Amino acid sequence: MRTKILHIKGKVTAGLGEGRIFLSIPYYIESFKKYLGFEPYAGTLNIVIYDRISLENRLILDLAKGIIIPEHKEPNRVLGSVKAFPSSINSISPAAIVIPARTTHPKSVIEIISPYYLREKLSLKDGDEVEIEVYL
């Protein structure tokens, strides 16, 4: 079976720092290692999508199966599920687009995780254009 590849282009944008909080929670760290095969850097790279084709490809991800990180109940909170898609960004992998079940982001903003601090590894700053290949 061949892997289908979707292309998404966008520009780097600043986040609120929430990705750093969630990616420091042991449940998510261990789950990403188990399901994606890597321990993510403690922070996400946020990308804003600005063209129609990339946005249509992003919307396909809502319907695609993806890799599901299950919801997890702890004594004083519930950690929501996350849908993930193995990806590369500007030809760097491993990486993954993550779509939390509970998010404040509009559909035009995606979050990327990787074992690397992607801003540094790719010399990125806000407004820089990136291309993501998503493997379905």
From Swiss-Prot:
Entry keyword set: Flavoprotein, FMN, Kinase, Magnesium, Metal-binding, Nucleotide-binding, Transferase
Domain of life assignment: Archaea
GO biological process: FMN biosynthetic process; riboflavin biosynthetic process
EC number assigned by the record: 2.7.1.161
GO molecular function, one term: riboflavin kinase activity
A Pfam short name: CTP-dep_RFKase
Enzyme class: transferase
Record InterPro entries: RibK_CTP-dep, Riboflavin_kinase_archaeal, Riboflavin_kinase_CTP-dep, Riboflavin_kinase_dom_sf
Binding positions for FMN per the UniProt entry: 103, 111
Pathway participation: Cofactor biosynthesis; FMN biosynthesis; FMN from riboflavin (CTP route): step 1/1
Reactions catalysed according to its record: riboflavin + CTP = CDP + FMN + H(+)
Residues binding CDP, per UniProt: 15-20, 116-119
Binding site for Mg(2+): 44, 46
Co-factor note (free text): Binds 1 Mg(2+) ion per subunit.
Cofactor: Mg(2+)
Function (record text): Catalyzes the CTP-dependent phosphorylation of riboflavin (vitamin B2) to form flavin mononucleotide (FMN).
Family statement drawn from the similarity comment of this UniProt entry: Belongs to the archaeal riboflavin kinase family.
UniProt xrefs under PANTHER family: RIBOFLAVIN KINASE (PTHR40706:SF1)
Full protein name: Riboflavin kinase
Source organism of the structure: Sulfurisphaera tokodaii (strain DSM 16993 / JCM 10545 / NBRC 100140 / 7)
Organism ancestry: Archaea, Thermoproteota, Thermoprotei, Sulfolobales, Sulfolobaceae
